[in-house]
């Protein structure tokens, strides 16, 4: 069931990351591990890094939603709707509150998925796919909101690798970013969490799916260049995972 977390919430998502992390260490023990997360995944990898940064060597945060002050309202609505309609209820109210602003920002394009990508072909593929653009369940939204809470909860961050490279990349026209000030705040939050090597890069003209934009090769090249430049070694702590 797309958009349903079966009651596992954010903890289940983070457990999945832990399992994959462990498997990668076992299969490729001599290679460094780079944790890359896009969109909701960017919240998940930060929530995971909050307690397990010693089990990775670099963190790349792509297309990250900025901290939303309306999150508590979303949590309250999701809990209320879940109580009344059940956890599998698909909330069009929360969907409108969460993504309505994204759609309105590009309403002149007359396509409700234009905020996804400036590349019209990619945006159309998104619209045509049954695996994209589905409405989350209340259960799914609760997981999303919890991941956002943990990702930005720098006061409870357990930074054990202050020199670990952290890279933020986003489209300059990505509405999930809200604005440049919010993007800069997200970058600064990671510094406040204890990391010394945090960089942020915005791509003009690109929207949320920068990995699918017409000039996507530039994004791939920049990320690959960043990884090679850092010459990271493998994480020393494997047994915790």
Can you name each region flagged by the protein language model?
Residues 175-185:
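Conserved alpha/beta-hydrolase "acid-adjacent" motif
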Residues 36-41, 45:
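Gly/Ala-rich beta-loop-alpha elbow adjacent to hydrolase catalytic centers
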